[in-house]
């Protein structure tokens, strides 16, 4: 596995965002939503869901907005790493609350990691890098006190990589007290969370109509502070040309994932701003170690060099 953070200069991997005039207190976003399978952070693994989940949920740590190569505390107040023991002892912010008003507890962190690994949806491979599997995950997590949780891993990875993994959307912390009562058939509330939210993010779900729209409203109690907007409406607009037209007409404030031709057509238009935003990524390389014709593939030194 290679951990890579994409810089701004890698233009082919950076999405452009176009912003026009915004109606008071409401942001209207035009983008495609047809790829969404679920908005449960333990299952969300498509572009549109990954773009939405961080508005609804937070992690103990997250990439810094201005420099994605750095990790910043969000629900965590501080942490201590023990490379030899392969542990992170994380102290949570004592005043952190979910949108429900419930406090963020070590139990919520443990529940969130256990459910993500046990559900074993498509994004679980990220947490598997730590050596976490359904059969061992419970033994890797421990409540130390009312505001402290210890995270352990069995894989041969550094605390720095462990923190980066815990900053990804699948490591989002959900409100156990809200989710657990909505569980059915041992699904950890997965079916319920496809249409609802239970996080501490800047916004909370008001309504989600698959293939139509997502409506989020401000979470005034978010640990990172209340957002400036009262609501966000994300409309499903599959066609990039239509997204561009909505921007030009002032019917949308933001359009995501426009093609190069759409961006070129908007460059220099009055009242329109094109933005390129860097983001953190993890890239994985797979080597065919069974290839007898190429012994390099089974050489660990080659893996590291690649």
Name each model feature, range by range:
Residues 28, 105-112, 146-152, 201-202, ...:
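Alpha-helical secondary-structure segments
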Residues 30-83, 114, 121, 198-200:
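N-terminal lobe/hinge region of extracytoplasmic solute-binding protein
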Residues 34-50, 72-75, 102, 156-172, ...:
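A structural "hinge/loop" feature
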Residues 77-123, 150, 246, 296, ...:
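Aromatic- and charge-enriched surface segment that lines or borders ligand/interaction sites
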Residues 91, 129-181:
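Surface-exposed binding/hinge segments that line
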Residues 167-227, 231:
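Gly/Pro-rich hinge or "lid" segments in bacterial periplasmic/extracellular proteins
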Residues 191, 219-265:
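Ligand-site clamp/hinge motif
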Residues 264-276:
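Ligand-binding "clamshell"
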